[in-house]
Every structure is written in structure tokens, then in C-alpha cells.
Amino acid sequence: MKSWKVKEIVIMSVISIVFAVVYLLFTHFGNVLAGMFGPIAYEPIYGIWFIVSVIAAYMIRKPGAALVSEIIAALVECLLGNPSGPMVIVIGIVQGLGAEAVFLATRWKAYSLPVLMLAGMGSSVASFIYDLFVSGYAAYSPGYLLIMLVIRLISGALLAGLLGKAVSDSLAYTGVLNGMALGKELKKKRKRASEHASL
């Protein structure tokens, strides 16, 4: 993180803290749903727990953004009283690594919507493998597991990838991300649009 700007670190930290609160709220909501419909009820909302990794990576576009943001969010969640306790930090690392692996595959150079959705799906796969070995998912039938995985993949793509991009773009339009990678990209797009309009 030596090449990171102070503004990048501050904004990433603030966003991670905000989403830590969101994560905790969804944890309680998910527990209610699971109590009513079983563990599969978590899957449609699972992608929300990956969103900060996509937002941070998309805004900053530097190695480690996806992973570090998830770790910060998990640490704050732990302090706020997540039912999983310190294990939520391990979960955050797993989820962050899943997203980071996708950006690594592009050498941190591609941040299109498909890549962001794949990052959400990467977290889905990583977290699902974790759940198989740690959360007792291995006890479920193969068919049930397949349905859970498919739903989680879709949730990761939509709630982390698509929604994460929408949130980031909205922040960029406010000007708060000026000087950061996404803010610079938006500035260039506006300049090109202005030049095109003047022709």
C-alpha cells in the first residue's frame, strides 16, 4: 500500500466502516430468514457481504483494495458484535481473496461491469468453499448445495458487482472521488462528451 494516497486510504476505510454496519444488519436479517426457511434463505442476499470489495477495487484500482476493504469491514463488524465473533475476520479475508483473485487475473487493469460481476462471483465461490468445510454445508445433499451455489453466484454478481458499480458511480458523480482512479475516469468521459457536443 506504499503507492496509495492518503485520500484513497481514508475513503476506503470510511466505506468499509459504513458497510460493516450494513453487513451486520443483513446478518441479523439473514438469521431471521434462515430461521423461517432454512440456510438457503441466506443465498439471495449473500452478495451484499461482498460489495465493499468491489466498490473499493473499482474506485481505487490498486492491488489489495478488495482484500483490505473486506478485512476492515470484518474487523469493525467484530467490534460491533457480529454473532460469529473473531471468525468474521477470517470470513472477511476469504471473501476479499475471492474478489481479489479476479482482479489479479486481469493484473488489476480491467474494471468493466463484467469483471466486477465476476469479482462478486469470485467471492461467492470462495465463501462457498469455506462454508463447505467450516459451516457444515457438506452435510447437505448435492442437489441442495448446487441450488445454494447458483443462487449465491447470482447474488454475488448482482448485489456485489452490479450494485457495487452503481454505488461507486453515484459517489463519483458527487465529486468526492476526484483525484482517485474512478474520479479521473469520469472526468475524462465528461471531457470527451463536452468536446463531442461542441463539434
From Swiss-Prot:
Q: What is its main location?
A: membrane
Keywords assigned: Cell membrane, Membrane, Transmembrane, Transmembrane helix, Transport
Where does it reside? Cell membrane
**Keyword Methyltransferase belongs to the record:** no
- According to the record, the signal peptide region is none
Asked whether the keyword Signal is assigned, the reply is no
Q: How does it sit in the membrane?
A: Multi-pass membrane protein
Domain of life according to the entry: Bacteria
**Residue spans crossing the bilayer:** 9-29, 40-60, 63-83, 85-105, 114-134, 143-163
Binding partners and assembly = The complex is composed of two ATP-binding proteins (YkoD), two transmembrane proteins (YkoC and YkoE) and a solute-binding protein (YkoF).
Instruction: Quote the function comment for this protein.
Output: Part of the ABC transporter complex YkoCDEF that could transport hydroxymethylpyrimidine (HMP) and/or thiamine. Could also transport other HMP-containing products. Probably responsible for the translocation of the substrate across the membrane.
Q: What is this protein called?
A: Putative HMP/thiamine permease protein YkoE
Q: Its encoding gene is what? A: ykoE
